[in-house]
Structures are given as structure tokens and as C-alpha cells.
């Protein structure tokens, strides 16, 4: 695994401030920042704690301002950008190297002839961040000063201090910071350094990326303590930031635990792929580690019968798992979870995690629907999705294909049967089976129900009301899956087969013979929609394809000609009047381009599998995935982005680490090796 940069990247402000790192803790918390150390997003910080795992994410420790005293010289290792654009200090100039050690960001700072190494990681399962310094080389001891800047806000927000007084108290090995009476305390601890407490607001940090996103770009942070010590050559110090009062303080012990955890993940992957692991490129190992960052715990409470489940606040009855859709801002979404599950868990040798996720979401099924998302603020789950539930069937099918777990299928079968029943007779949002043609209809005015779900105020950018092609391809596959499960369990299967046969017979309505590919949506309020979008690729990539071989080839070729890029498929063909080549600006501008030409990385997986089905050339199919190896070095380091601009140079945008992009690259790579 070779993500590493020297001075040509680290010493240039533009490049070192645009490449971002991420570490996570398995319960929704994370730390994130730039190589330079400058804050450019409201989501940057050393401890963003999940106070209601996996949500309730709260910025607690923003950063450490690091200063080295050595040979009568003062070296400021931090980098800050202030209102007005001034960059001071410029610590990025001292970075000799940055690399990822697994997922652990590692810096080496050159201060004269001294070399100081820094690592940042989190404890799995705890809101605890470790910042560890090693003095690798020096001709005499250094003085190291660490100024702790804190906050206490939702990670989506931004704070102006307005005279906010936090309680800063000394504890045995550091300080305890309490932002308000009901706030969760932050402990800043080191058993090696002395701590001097302060209460000094730093005003007007400039968040350049937030400004580009049309959002508030100013923030204040509170300096609560300075830790200082004399560090000898060959010695180390660890600063621990935690919501726990007594975390492990030995940095070497904690670091070894983290390394062992990541090695275990790679062992799962390699054991599962013993037949081919020796031929895998190193960058796939980095993706396996990235895959784990999205898998988090979710505590489930079982609601009373016939009640819509609410976000769990009461006593836990089940310890479950879920998938965060993307860092830094997404929560767990039903659609993203089910699409991501095969690649993040099954493709990495972690079927037991897949089982937990499938069981977790079964408790949230309501009126035959999976939740669309769980809001960060802890309200009821939202159910405005037509496809998440159908992706649930596909995730279970792939899980069973790998595990042959009859017990889980038997457990979930009543839920699956209920889902089919609700869809046949009709559920929320006018989602129902049209008895006239056996196709699934979805939508009402003002709603967005498919994955192309951008909405600004009352403006639904891509309403797709009617019979979307990918929804009906998924519906057809769900019916065939249910028929197989029914036969396996000795239950009646004829009804599922009959509905599936009817869907198959009328799926031909999607074929647009005039252009040689499929309509995107049938029976919209204005007729059939002939717009070339990538959604039809799923009618080829899913196991049960309702298209003829000639139609499959037509779809793949059309997508390859007009939608394919190095990092995914465009959401709209460039020759369409609504095509948007640029993704940027304020929320309205961004959402207006989100599915109107913007490239989506996750779609490369379905394209590769569809191409493999049509052309039966695994070497060529795999070549479509190889540009992602370069992308691991360019945005969210060690991970894959959510979206990219539609025109060259296909600039990455959106989340720096997106679950379904990582998942689909892993899944598709596995498919090319079968």
C-alpha cells in the first residue's frame, strides 16, 4: 500500500490543503483533516464524536496547534487560514513526508536536523482519538507545545463564540472540558506532558471549501489548554482526546491495537480470496481497509406491533450494524446500505457483518418499505424511497449465494413476503403494482423516490414519477428471488413466478427501438421519458436480466459511448439540454447538477458487470476499474469519492469517502476474477 507524498505535494499549499485524510471508530465518530493541517471544512477535526451512535456527531477537539523549540529556533508546525485569506502559521512548509500507514495518517516534520513524526488514529468502538509524536532524529531534546482548540457543535454547523464560557477543569493527567451543563465532557489527557489551562477564543478561521459550497465560511474555536514537555530523541508522547474519563493512555499499546485490527481485516480478505489474493494489486488492500470505515454499530429497539419504528432512544434490545453512506456528512441510508453491503462485507470476507446488517434493517420495515435514511437529529426514520426495499432483496440474494444461510432466509422470509404483498396492493407515495402490465409505479407530485433524489425547496430536480427502469429491473429480480426462496423453504412459489412472468412479458415496453436503448421512465405525466441516463445499466447487471442479448448489448454500448468516464458513469448524457458539466456553487446550484450530468463513482460497478456479461472479457472489464487506483491518492486519501464533474478533468466532488463507490469497485473486481 503506497499512499505517500514528499515535499512536492506537502510543501505546496494548494495541493496539501486539498488532499484530505479520514480515520473512524466504528460507531459513527471520525477525525478528518488535510495534509497541510489547515481547516477547510466544518467537518474537519481531531474528534468528531458520535454521541448517539452512529449519529449525534459532534465536533469536540478541532485541532492541535503544534510548536517546536529546537536550537533556539521556533518551528510552528500548524497551518491556519484566517478571514481575509492570510495563511499563518505555514507549518505545511515543514512537512517532509505524509503517508497512510493502513488508514493511519502519518506526518514527518523536518525542523533543522530534527525529524518529528506524528500519527492520528481512533480506538475502535470508542469516541477516542490518539495523536502520537515520535522524535525520530535530533541532536538535542526539543520543546514540544500542543495548544488544544475545542468546540462543541453538530458537525454540520459552524460556531461564532459570542462569549461562550466553557468549564475547563484540571484532572489527574490533563484537562476536562464541559461545554454546557448537559454536554458530554471532553477529556484531553497525557501522562507525559504538563497541561496549562486557558480559555482563549481564536476568531475567524476561514473555511474555504464551505465558501465554495455556498455556506458559512467563518468559525471560532476555543483554546483550552497547552500541553508541553521536553522530548528526547528516540522518545514519544501521546495526547488522547476522549469522551471517556479513563481511556488507554499508552500510545504504543493503542497503536498496536489499531494495527492488529487492520491486519485482521486484511486477513479476512486474503483468506476469503486465497485462490487469487497473490495476484491482487496493493491498492485493493487499501480499499478493503476503507470499506470498514463505513460499517458502524446501530442500537435497535423493537417498537410495539403495528407502530412505525422510531429512532432508538429507549433501552436497547438488539445490537445491530449499519453502513454510513459517506464521510463526512451522510448518515445511514437504507438504499446506500443495501447497495453497499455486498461489496463492503461479502467481497471482503465478512459475511457475519452482512448478516447483522440485514437483521438490523428488518426491524425498521414499515408498510413494506425500508427507511430511506435515519436523520442525524434523531427523529423518525424517513421512508421516501421506492428502491431501497428492492435493493434489500438483492443484498439478501447475494448474501445467500455466498453463505447458503438457510436460517437467515427463514427468519426474514415473512418480512420479505409482506414487502411483496404491500407493493402488490399499494403502499406509501403511490407505490403500487400496475395490474395492466405488471410493472411497478411510484411517485406523487413533489416527491423524489429513486436514487436520483435531489430536491431544493419544492423543486424536485429529477422527479422520475412513473415506472423507472431500474426500479422495475429490481422488482423483477426480487420476485425471482422470492420464488427461489419459497421453493427452498417448501412454501408456495407459483404466485411470485406468475407476477415475475408478467413483469418480464411487459418489460419490453422499456425498449426504445428508435435509439437502440431503453426509456428511463415509462408512463410519466408527459409520456415515456427517452432521456439517456445510466439507470438502464441495472437491467443488464442484475442476475435476472429482463432484456434480450441484443438489447443488453445496446444498453452497454450506449452507456459506454455517452456516459462512461474514468471514474464512473455520467448521470445524464452530455448531448441532453439539461446536462450540467460543472458541479459547484450554493446548495441549489449543486443539487441542480447532482443528477444532471455529474459522474457517480458507484455506477462503475454495475457497468463493469454488465460489460462482462455482454462481452465476456474479464481483462477488459477490469481495466475500467483501474483508474480508481490513482484516485485513491487525489481527494479522500485511501478512499473513493462520491461524485465527479461530468467534463474533463473529471474533478472529484461531494463526499471524500463514499460507501457505495468503494463497495462497487470491490464487488466488480471480484466479479472479474470468477
Regions found by a protein language model. Give the residues of each.
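Acidic, mature catalytic/reactive cores of soluble proteins
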Residues: 1-674
